């Protein structure tokens, strides 16, 4: 399992995070849905709650099954998802073995053991990595950064009865394949859809949230802060057009300029 030198400090879960963590429970009215999509702003608390929910669901529902987890690259997934996830699992009484050579996480608790294969979905060739394997579920982190062929191949591998999908991402352009084929068709695919903002992450202080709000403008504000699927076309920085005089340079004195 390896030595964990830092303890995970739990913060209160927000209402939407609690939905992510509990939608699959038998007493939930939506537990028979095929999966869940969480999109929205950066730093909004999607990733950790989605990853934890995925493992909790799989450990409560199956034993001895294979599951898939993916980021754009394996390195990014290990850094952004697996590192904090392992701390949380350890704190909640799970035990695990990380077989790094095989990119396999073996998780055990109360006599139940399941196996989680880690994939990178960085290009069209990535679909070959998941061919042939039979899975009981798949978790996609930053799915909008992956090619559609990889996601189609990975979801098709989930043929075990009761298998489900977890997707989370930050938004991209409105015609992005995941927006068009999955979010816009969530009802038809029998998927839960939740939209997140920074206010859904109770671990962020108002000071930090305000700093992020001031950091981005234009299309980047709409995507990163509001979590909207907007196109980077036309006025990327509309504040310049709205206040042209404030940014205009009326005159420049070239007399005092020193050329190299």
Predicted regions and their residues:
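Conserved P-loop
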Residues: 35-100
């Amino acid at each position: 399992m390896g030595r964990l030198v830092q303890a995970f400090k739990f913060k209160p879960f927000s209402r939407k995070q609690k939905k992510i963590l509990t939608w699959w429970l038998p007493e939930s009215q939506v537990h028979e849905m095929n999966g869940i999509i969480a999109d929205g702003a950066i730093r909004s608390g999607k990733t950790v709650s989605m990853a934890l929910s995925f493992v909790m669901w799989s450990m409560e529902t199956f034993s001895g099954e294979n599951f898939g987890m993916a980021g754009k690259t394996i390195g990014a997934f290990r850094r952004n998802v697996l590192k904090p996830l392992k701390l949380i699992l350890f704190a909640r009484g799970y035990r695990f073995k990380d077989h790094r050579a095989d990119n396999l996480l073996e998780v055990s608790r109360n006599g139940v053991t399941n196996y989680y294969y880690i994939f990178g979905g960085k290009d069209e060739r990535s679909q070959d990595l998941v061919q042939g394997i039979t899975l009981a579920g798949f978790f996609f982190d930053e799915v909008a950064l992956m090619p559609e062929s990889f996601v189609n191949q990975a979801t098709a591998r989930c043929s075990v009865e009761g298998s489900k999908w977890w997707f989370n991402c930050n938004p991209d352009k409105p015609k992005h394949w995941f927006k068009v084929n999955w979010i816009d068709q969530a009802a038809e695919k029998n998927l839960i859809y939740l939209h997140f903002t920074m206010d859904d992450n109770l671990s962020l202080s108002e000071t930090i949230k305000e700093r992020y709000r001031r950091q981005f403008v234009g299309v980047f504000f709409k995507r990163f802060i509001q979590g909207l699927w907007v196109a980077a076309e036309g006025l990327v920085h509309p504040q310049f057009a709205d206040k042209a005089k404030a940014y205009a340079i009326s005159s420049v004195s070239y007399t005092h300029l020193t050329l190299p």
